[in-house]
From Swiss-Prot:
GO molecular function annotations of the record: D-tyrosyl-tRNA(Tyr) deacylase activity; Gly-tRNA(Ala) deacylase activity; Ser(Gly)-tRNA(Ala) hydrolase activity; tRNA binding
Annotated Gene Ontology cellular component terms: cytoplasm
NCBIfam families linked to this entry: D-aminoacyl-tRNA deacylase
Coiled coil segments of this chain: none
Protein name: D-aminoacyl-tRNA deacylase
Subcellular location: Cytoplasm
Entry text on domains: A Gly-cisPro motif from one monomer fits into the active site of the other monomer to allow specific chiral rejection of L-amino acids.
SUPFAM superfamilies referenced in this protein's UniProt entry, alphabetically: DTD-like
Gene that produces this protein: dtd
């Protein structure tokens, strides 16, 4: 499992020109699921994202997590994160979890995130989404759970 997380001052997801998820200050997290991923690894990833200290403390040091700053978490499923790119000039998506299985695990991941944090929004699994983000920093990190 991989996550590309971005510290944002605001972010939103639109599907068919309708906003389906949005947050103010917080983390925009693109989630890539692989065939070996489980509910346990999904929970571990959510815990890591929520605890990752990418917000400034009073001294300007990255020392606070999204919960400590009362920020939002916007989760967006992103199978392309699992692409193999080491050969050729075309991505190979064989490393991604099959869509039906990924949809179910992503739903479970969202449910767990909402149990852990009260400001959780999502995109729409499998939809063509327009994601807008006001990156803060910018600060971007790739997190991996195996």
């Amino acid at each position: 499992m991989k996550a590309l997380i971005q510290r944002v001052s605001a972010a939103s997801v639109r599907v068919d020109n309708q906003i389906v998820g949005q947050i103010e200050q917080g983390i925009l997290a693109y989630i890539g699921l692989g065939p070996e991923d489980t509910l346990k690894s999904a929970q571990k990833m959510i815990d890591k994202i929520l605890g990752y200290r990418i917000f400034d403390n009073d001294a300007g040091k990255l020392d606070k997590n999204v919960q400590q700053v009362a920020g939002g978490l916007l989760l967006v499923s992103q199978f392309t994160l699992m692409a193999k790119t080491d050969k050729g000039r075309r991505p190979d998506f064989g490393g991604a979890m099959p869509p039906a299985q990924a949809s179910e695990l992503f739903k479970q991941m969202i449910d767990y995130a909402k149990q852990q944090h009260d400001k959780v929004a999502t995109g729409e699994f499998g939809a063509n989404m327009l994601v807008q983000a006001d990156n803060d920093g910018p600060l971007n990190f790739i997190l991996e759970i195996s």
